[in-house]
Amino acid sequence: MDQHCHNALKVANYLSQHPKVEKTIYPSLADHPQHALASKQMSQGGSIVTFVIKGNNAFKFMNKLNIFDISNNFGDTKSLVTHPATTTHRVIGEEGRKKLNIPDAMIRLSIGLEDVDDLIEDIDASFKQIL
């Protein structure tokens, strides 16, 4: 888990600075609304990084990734990506997702054990291809 968390923090920091990302959600980022609580309860931020991509590009972005596999569930040593609005939160419906602040542009990453620089390079290449 240490390597998952280390990689996830680096990916979250990268995404939080990217101009094509509207919002990055990761409990170890200082701007996370529950950062202080997470710091007290957790030694690390976990392996899941969520972000909202600018524009209507979630599927285009996901389809251009090479290292990440598209999946509707997480729990692997390999990096995975999912689209919450059409997988985990599909049954809630559009209005329910709006109330829960789960936009269609939201993407969730499960960060694996691959080299973190390779993961960031894959993400960056996907951004460059679609936007």
Locations of regions flagged by a protein language model:
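Conserved strand-to-helix beginnings and helix N-cap segments that scaffold or border functional pockets
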Residues: 1, 5, 120-121
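Conserved small-domain helix->loop->beta segment predominantly found in fold-type I
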Residues: 3, 9-72, 92-94, 98
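A generic structural signal for well-ordered coil/turn residues at beta-strand boundaries
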Residues: 45-47, 75-77, 103-105
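PLP-dependent enzyme catalytic core of the Aspartate aminotransferase-like
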Residues: 81-131
